[in-house]
């Protein structure tokens, strides 16, 4: 990989130049800006739920709350990558430990019937219908396991600051994906087995995450009080992780297109992102619809299709060619086709 000045896109910046680099940078922003909206909406909803249901504070309406929170997030982003990475690093381990603790605390309340009942329903459902339902969840799955915007700044940071930075960056990426994959699977399994179905229905209806509607049982009633706080920390960390790469990339794109000073262009870009984020977060669109219609399919292009294209068009990546690449392409096309089906 060639070294580039574009630290926000260390991979794409190596294989595109000129107009191609501007287009891929724009597509990156278009892809991951909706992800920040998902986390922004989820954060405001979780915070509002905490204030109303747990602290019984109803004086703050959604408008002022959204403005204050979104403004605070963009102030943090304006401090630069090093500061955001430091904040993310400080939050990462406590947040991960808290999520795993909640997942473990749910184990005494596991009910295998939650799985067996679902399995029985699947057996009673025709196989084509079951496969179709799984297929239509691909955008959600793609979104859930994507951590590219958060891993990219971290790996770029190590690449630039450490000796043998390339090896350190690859190590960070591998460990991050392994940890995220394992923790997501365990947490989801524990929630499915330990949380009543009605809670999931309520979360979907109220546009909340599952931690905000979690209720403790017996010795674990403390979960009712700490789970919403953990959800807020998680949404904040995720917003900063994704928003960092989007803000920096959009700022650099604005500077290159406008021809103005980089500092002025970045301030204008940040202001535009802030206003759009505030407006959409205040509107409170359905989070799952955002993921299914925008985030999942666009992320599939970034994660599956563009890398496959580069592997077969760039000689430096020839060693990566093989059957695996075709499987990656199939995964991307399947995710995109799920979007097209829902639009019909």
Predicted regions, residues:
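Hydrophobic, small-residue-rich membrane helices and short re-entrant helix-turn-helix hairpins
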Residues: 7, 79-89, 119-122, 150-179, ...
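Membrane-interface loop-to-helix entry segments
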Residues: 43, 47, 63-109, 292-306, ...
């Amino acid at each position: 990989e060639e070294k580039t000045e574009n630290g926000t896109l260390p991979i794409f910046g190596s294989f595109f130049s000129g107009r191609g680099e501007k287009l891929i940078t724009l597509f990156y922003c278009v892809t991951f800006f909706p992800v920040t909206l998902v986390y922004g909406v989820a954060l405001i909803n979780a915070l509002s739920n905490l204030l109303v249901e747990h602290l019984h504070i109803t004086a703050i309406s959604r408008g002022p709350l959204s403005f204050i929170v979104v403004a605070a997030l963009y102030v943090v982003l304006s401090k630069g990558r090093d500061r955001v990475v430091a904040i993310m690093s400080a939050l990462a381990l406590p947040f991960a430990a808290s999520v795993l603790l909640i997942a473990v605390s749910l184990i005494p309340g596991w009910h295998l019937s939650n799985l067996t009942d679902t399995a029985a329903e699947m057996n009673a459902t025709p196989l084509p219908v079951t496969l179709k339902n799984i297929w239509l969840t691909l955008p959600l799955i793609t979104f859930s396991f994507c951590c590219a915007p958060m891993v990219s700044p971290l790996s770029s940071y190590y690449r630039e600051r450490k000796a043998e930075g390339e090896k350190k960056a690859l190590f960070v990426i591998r460990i991050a994906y392994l940890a995220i994959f394992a923790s997501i699977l365990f947490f989801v399994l524990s929630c499915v087995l330990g949380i009543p179905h009605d809670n999931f229905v309520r979360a979907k209806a109220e546009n909340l995450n599952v931690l905000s509607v979690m209720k403790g049982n017996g010795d674990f009633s403390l979960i009712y009080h700490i789970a919403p706080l953990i959800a807020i920390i998680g949404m904040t960390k995720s917003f900063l992780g994704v928003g960092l790469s989007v803000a920096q990339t959009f700022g650099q794109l604005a500077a290159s297109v406008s021809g103005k000073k980089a500092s002025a262009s970045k301030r204008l870009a940040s202001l535009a992102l802030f206003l759009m984020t505030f407006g959409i977060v205040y509107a409170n669109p359905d989070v799952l619809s955002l993921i299914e219609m925008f985030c999942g399919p666009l992320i599939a292009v970034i994660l599956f299709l563009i890398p496959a294209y580069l592997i077969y068009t760039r000689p430096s990546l020839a060693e990566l060619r093989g059957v695996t690449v075709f499987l990656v392409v199939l995964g991307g096309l399947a995710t995109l086709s799920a979007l097209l089906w829902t639009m019909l």
